[in-house]
């Protein structure tokens, strides 16, 4: 992985447009974590080896996981200092445009954005999925009736969005999922 610090205000504004997140230009620090197989390719080639694995799904998943772990470590470090953080998965709304803006070469892909700064307010914690939905024992288990099992969670998420001051929307978790899968 590699980390790109976004310090150019115009670039922050363009990323905010891609992500549909108007607060991004005001973030104290903006980072984009990228899957970086280019560096490994250049190293392999410099050593005279053929870089054949950079396009494999396994290598991509491993490198993507590394980028996400690095982002989480930055969150832990920032929060230990009293700073606030916001993951920005929405930077991937237009992956091609973001890659062009960041001048990402072949074998480098955006993974996640991260805004870090001193919070103006103490935000309400976003509701988490119920434990029985995300934690299983021994084997994968489908939800028997997803809409019924997530009914209470939908109500919590709806209330969470309704009470927000910024980026207010009336939405439910299951509706968000359906929209992204359509």
Model-derived segments and spans:
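Acidic, surface-exposed loops and disordered segments
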Residues: 1-182
């Amino acid at each position: 992985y590699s980390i790109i610090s976004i310090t150019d205000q115009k670039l922050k504004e363009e990323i905010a447009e891609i992500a549909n997140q108007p607060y991004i230009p005001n973030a104290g620090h903006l980072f984009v974590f990228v899957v970086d197989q280019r560096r490994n390719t250049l190293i392999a080639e410099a050593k005279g080896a053929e870089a054949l694995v950079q396009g494999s799904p396994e290598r991509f998943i491993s490198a993507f996981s590394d980028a996400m772990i690095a982002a989480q470590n930055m969150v832990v470090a920032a929060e230990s200092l009293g700073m606030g953080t916001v993951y920005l998965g929405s930077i991937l709304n237009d992956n091609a445009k973001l890659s062009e803006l960041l001048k990402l070469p072949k074998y480098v892909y955006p993974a996640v954005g991260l805004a870090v700064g001193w919070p103006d307010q103490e935000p309400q914690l976003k509701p988490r999925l119920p434990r029985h939905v995300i934690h299983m024992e021994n084997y994968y288990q489908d939800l028997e009736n997803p809409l019924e099992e997530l009914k209470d969670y939908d109500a919590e998420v709806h209330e969470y969005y309704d009470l927000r001051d910024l980026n207010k929307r009336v939405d439910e978790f299951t509706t968000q999922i359906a929209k992204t899968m359509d």
